């Protein structure tokens, strides 16, 4: 955390030995999310220390073929609760709307002090102490990189988008706090939405979902990337709109390991990491690179992970056909939205 502007607070010590009052929320549906979610939760149960026995709720918030019997068996074995919800959402086609629906659905059903959203492409390498909300802090997240649509300021090509986005909460872009990314950039208030923790009493999940829909209603985005990654922009703007006290997580609590950040495949960089955001590193082409990176600092993770091999989609022709049908329908709805907004995936006017 660098520029600690309005709403930011300083880091404090955590209480050792006590399980946090926290619920973990994930999404699960037929396909790749099945093995990814199971592997993520197993890493939590094995290596999560005080966090290992937290309640995990896997939400299915949109239409999907049935989960496999093996997935249901492993969910029961790992103590994962499954929640099906059927929201009436016109933006079900959005790649990440399911995450917002999931967090809002769980928020109204649990009583823990904190709720943590965890993407399924994450591994817990050791006890993730940084994820516990300190007193007086309402929201935790990290900014490992500027991503595709982050803005470094007025000269950044993405900045007009940030001006339009800030306007929806009655601000201008220069009102937003600055963050220092893990790869050394100073950017506007743009969090990674793969892992965040918030105080349940703030009702952040409900407000985040409402803001997400509003941003799509108002057609703030003018490119495919702006639509695709909009949840990460809305995440921070909802924090600002609600006036929440926030704190940036260190990179070690959400460290990215992926093909587009090749320099992170470095055992020395990963040694101190407690939460690994591996993105595409479980694919066959990067599998050995992932294992080699884990050896120096996390031999126990390497030993557990190596026999499992790369992640693959459960084999089922009917499920594959059904998923493809849903993908085509959602793709058509997405293209219709782009057309109404005046652009297509491959081309857009000035941002």
Locate predicted features.
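Glycosyltransferase catalytic domains, chiefly GT-A lineage
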Residues: 3-351
